[in-house]
Amino acid sequence: MSLVYLLIAILVIMAMILLTSKRRAMAKYAGYIALTAPVIASIYFLLQVPSVIKQHYLSVSIPWMTSLDINVDLRLDGLSLMFSLIISLIGIAVFFYATQYLSSRKDNLPRFYLYLTLFMFSMLGIVLADNTILMYVFWELTSVSSFLLISYWYNNGDSQFGAMQSFMITVFGGLALLVGFIMLYIMTGTNNITEILGQADHIKNHALFIPMIIMFLLGAFTKSAQFPFHIWLPRAMAAPTPVSAYLHSATMVKAGIFLLLRFTPLLGLSNMYIYIVTFVGLITMLFGSITALKQWDLKGILAYSTISQLGMIMAMVGIGGGYAQHQQDAIASIYVFVLFAALFHLMNHAIFKCALFMGVGILDHEAGSRDIRILSGMRQLFPKMNLVMMIAALSMAGVPFLNGFLSKEMFLDALTQTGQLSQFSLISMIIIVCMGVIASIFTFTYALYMVKEVFWTKYDSKVFTKKNIHEPWLFSLPSLILMVLVPVIFFVPNIFGKGIIVPALRGVSGGNHQIDPLVPHVSQWHGFNIPLLLTIIIILLGSVLAIKVDWKKVFTGKIRQISVSKGYEMVYRQFEKFTTKRFKRVMQDRLNQYIIMTLGIFMVIIGYGYIRIGLPKVHQLHVSEFGPLEVILAIVTVIIGLSLIFIRQRLTMVILNGVIGFVVTLFFIAMKAPDLALTQLVVETITTILFIVSFSRLPNVPRSKVNKKREIIKISVSLMMALIVVSLIFIAQQADGLASISNFYLRADKLTGGKNIVNAILGDFRALDTLFEGLVLIITGLGIYTLLNYQDRRGQDERE
C-alpha cells in the first residue's frame, strides 16, 4: 500500500466518524471507528521496518503546483519511520483510552474523535513530507487541530484561553518557519527536502543561511515548547487528558525536534545553531524541572516535566548537530553517540510520559481531583495506578532497571564528552554538565515527590471525601501496557536500537552509510565511570529533596506569583487594547467606508506598479463601432451616476441604481447579445425588488449630516478608479507581443455545444471558476444557516 493510500484511508475514517454525528445512537461508536486509523497505520509501518532496515525507502511524488515546485512528495526513511511508529502506536493506546475516558452522554464524541484523527493525520504528514511547503501545510494543520482539541470543552474559560495562546504562539512559529522555507527555495531553487540537503555545502556560504537558521529555530522552539515559548504548554492542560497524553507529551511537542533532526545535515554546519540549541535546551530543562515543583495540579507538574524533558532532548540534538561538520573526523563517534541518545530518550519519554498522563487522567476521572493537596494515600484506592505512575515516574527520574535510566546515563555521558568537541571549551563543558546535573536532580525530586504525595502519604478522609472509588480494568489497560514496556526496553534495548533507532540515525545523517560503524551498543552496565557517579549524586540529592522538603510550603507568596506566563498575559492584554482602538477606528459598520478602503489599497498597488514600470505609449487604440443609440445610453448612464452623488433618499438611489442596470441591458441589445441582455434584465429586476423589499426589515436610522470631507473622498476614489480602469484598457491594447485569447474562444466554442460564446465560457472554459463561485455561495448559505440556528442549538445543549 502506498503512503498516499494510507493517508487517504485515514481521511475516509474521518468521514465515517463524521457520519456518526447524525445519530446519537451511533455517536458512542465514533471512538472505535476512529481507533481503526492508528491500528491500520501501525500495521502498515511495522510491516515497513524490515525494508527500512535494509535501506529500501519508500517515496511518492504527485505533481501539484509544479510551476512553484510544490508537489505531494512523501518519503519513508528511518527517521520518519521512527516518528510514524510513535505517532501510530501511542495513538492506539490514546484512542482506546479516550473511549473509556469520555462519556457519550456528556461529550460530543464524533467531534472529539474527528479532531483527534485529524491531528494524527497532520502529524504523519509532517514526518512523511519530503517537500517544505507540504510540510508547512501539515505543520499548521497540527496547530489548528491542537486548537480545536484544547478548546473541546469550549464552555471552560481556561480551555478557551489555553487554545488561543497555544494557537498564537505555534502559528507565529509556523509563519517564521515558512519564511525559512522560502529562503531555502531562494538559495536552492527547489522545495524538495532531499534535494535541499544535497546542496548543504552550497547553502552554508549563502547570505541567507543564518537568517534561515533563525527562522527554523523559531518554528522548532515554539512547537516544542522551549524557553521562553514554553508558556502555551501548561495552559494547554485544560484539554481532556487523552489530548494531553497524545499531543502534549508524545507527538506534537516532538514536531520541532523532528524538524531539527531532519535538517541536521544542513543546520549543523553552523556553530551558532549548535550553541543556541544546546543552551536553550539546557535552560529549558533546568527551568522546567524547578517550576514543576511549584505546581499543585498533577497535570501542571507533568506539563513542566514535559518542558524539561523536551529541553533535555533538544540539548542533545544541538550537541549532536556537529556531526554535519565532522563526519570524517575521529570525534564523529561522539556526535553519533549524542544523536543516538537523543533518539533513544525521545522514544522512552513518549512511553513513560504517556503512561503518567493516563494515570493522572484516571485519578481525575474517578477521584474528581488532580490537586496533590487533596489527594493522599491513593495507593489504597488505586493500586494499579500506584504501580503505573511509580514505575513511569522513576523511569523519568533515571532509576536503574527502567528504560529512562539508560537514556539518562547516555545523556550524562554526552555532557561529559562535550569538552572533546571543537565547538565547546572546557569552561563550556563544566557549565553544560552543571546545568544538566542540577536539572536532573530536580527532575528526580519532582518525580519522587509527586508519587510520594499522591500515593505514599497517609490517607486523610477529612480532606478527600469522595466515596465509591473504582479502578476499571479497561480504563487502566493502555497505561498498564505502556508500564510493562518501561522495564522491557531496559533489558532488551538493542532490539529497539537496531530496528528503529539506527535507521533513524541514518535519516538524521542524510542517508550517510558511514554512520553504521559508529553507532553505540547499549548495555545496562558500563562500569564505574563519571556518568554513574553523577547518577548516584542525582539519586541521593534528589531523594533527600523529595522526602525532607515540603515543596507545597516552599513556593508560596510572592515567589509563587513569579511567572513568565503572566508577562505574556500582560503583553497580550495591552496588544488587545491597542488593536481594539485601531479596529474601532477603522471598522465603523459603514459599507461604503470598507469599499473605499479596499479600492484605496488596490489603487496604491496599481499606482506603485505604474511608478515602477511607467505607462506605455499609446500608439494604437481600438474603438468599437458605435451609433447614436450607444452615445445616448452612455450620456444617460453618466447623468444617473452623477446624480447618485447628490441624492439622499434611499429608495430613489436604489431605483436609479437599477435604471443603470437596465441601461446596460440596452447596451447588450445594441451589441446584438440577446442572451446577455436577458440575463442582465432578470438579475437586475430581482436584485432591485429584493433591495426595495429589504427596506421593510431595516431599522429607521436617522439621516446623518452630510460630511463634505467624506463626500470629497468618495468622489475622488470613484474618479481615480475610473481613470485606472480606462488606463488598464489602454495598456491592454498596446500588448503587441501577445496574441489575444478571444480568438481561441471564438474558434473553440462550437466544441462545447453552447448556443453562444458567453454560455460556453461560463459552462466550459471557466467551468472550474464557476464551480467555486457556487461553492462560495454554498459556504455563505451554510454560515447564515448556522447563525440563524445558533440560539436553537444553544438552548438544546443547555437542556441536555
UniProtKB/Swiss-Prot annotation:
Pfam families: MbhD, MbhE, Proton_antipo_M, Proton_antipo_N
Signal peptide boundaries: none
GO annotation, cellular component aspect: plasma membrane
GO biological process, one term: monoatomic ion transport
Molecular function (Gene Ontology), one example: antiporter activity
Keyword entries, A-Z: Antiport, Cell membrane, Ion transport, Membrane, Transmembrane, Transmembrane helix, Transport
Ranges annotated as spanning the membrane: 1-21, 33-53, 78-98, 118-138, 167-187, 207-227, 241-261, 273-293, 300-320, 331-351, 387-407, 424-444, 472-492, 527-547, 595-615, 627-647, 651-671, 676-696, 712-732, 768-788
Location within or outside the cell: Cell membrane
Membrane topology, as annotated: Multi-pass membrane protein
PANTHER family assigned to the protein according to its UniProt record, in alphabetical order: NA(+)/H(+) ANTIPORTER SUBUNIT (PTHR43373), NA(+)_H(+) ANTIPORTER SUBUNIT A (PTHR43373:SF1)
Subunit relationships: May form a heterooligomeric complex that consists of seven subunits: mnhA2, mnhB2, mnhC2, mnhD2, mnhE2, mnhF2 and mnhG2.
Family recorded in the similarity comment: Belongs to the CPA3 antiporters (TC 2.A.63) subunit A family.
Protein name according to UniProt: Putative antiporter subunit mnhA2
Encoding gene per record: mnhA2
